[in-house]
Design a protein with these regions (language model features):
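GIY-YIG nuclease catalytic motif and its immediate N-terminal context
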Residues: 1-51, 58-73
Length: 73
C-alpha cells in the first residue's frame, strides 16, 4: 500500500510521520496544520525519508515545508 510522509505543526513542534490515509491521520492528531507531504511511495522509501527528515534541524524542516506548492495541500 502506498504511503505518504507528512509534517504537521503540533503544539508548536514539527511532527514528521507516515500514513496511508492523510485525512484520517490528521483527525487523529487533532487536525493540526499540514505543512508538507510527499508521496505516494512504497513503505521502505517512506520509512527512509521519514528517518532522514526526523534527523534534520527545525530550520531545514521549515525550509522543506516552504517549498511545497499550495495545490498539494
Amino acid at each position: 500500500m502506498d504511503r505518504l510522509v507528512y509534517i504537521v505543526d503540533k503544539s508548536g513542534k514539527l511532527y514528521v510521520g507516515i500514513t496511508t490515509d492523510i485525512d484520517n491521520r490528521l483527525r487523529q492528531h487533532g487536525n493540526p496544520p499540514l505543512l508538507h507531504k510527499e508521496g505516494p511511495m512504497i513503505n521502505v522509501e517512506a520509512v527512509n525519508r521519514e528517518r532522514q527528515i526526523k534527523g534534520w534541524n527545525r530550520e531545514k524542516k521549515q525550509s522543506l515545508c516552504e517549498k511545497m506548492p499550495e495545490k498539494q495541500m
